[in-house]
Amino acid sequence: YQIALSKSYGCDCILIIIAALNGAQADEIYSEALKHNLSVIVEVHDQKEAEMALKFDQALIGINNRNLKTLEVSLNNTISIFEVIKTHKGPIISESGIKTANDAKYIYEKTGIKNFLIGESLLKSNNPNELMKKLIQITQ
């Protein structure tokens, strides 16, 4: 019901957090989203979740660098999880903990990932435009 309602309000993408659902729930939500012509981001936090996410072949996969239990952030989480999902045909996103262009460059050089979810760093930046320019340049 929520997926259909979201679509009716103009939603074009949903987020499935693997850690918050069991396998059957994730499957059902994914199928329902595709029926409503919605894009799906499947978020993973560890290698086990990444293995589960591979079956969602039309999804974007987001690798969250924040440990949900400790709230610690490690960019190396993207590096290690990427090894599990590097065969995924869709886009892969590195999420959380990217504070500088050098952080993004580190991930890009290790994995080739050039999609990043960056929020806090942009909000706290004295010059978000300059930060965005630097981030965009790393993949060009």
Q: Which residues does each predicted region cover?
A:
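Glycine-rich phosphate-binding active-site loops on the catalytic face of alpha/beta enzymes
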Residues: 3-25, 62-71, 111-132
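Short loop-to-alpha-helix "cap/lid" segments that border enzyme active sites
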Residues: 3, 21-31, 45-47, 51-58, ...
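Catalytic cores of alpha/beta
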Residues: 1-9, 46-57, 89, 94, ...
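Short, surface-exposed connector motifs at secondary-structure boundaries
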Residues: 10-14, 32-37, 85-90, 111-114
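Active-site glycine- and acidic-residue-rich loops that bind
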Residues: 35-46
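C-terminal helical cap(s) of enzyme catalytic domains, especially alpha/beta-barrels
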Residues: 75-84, 122-140
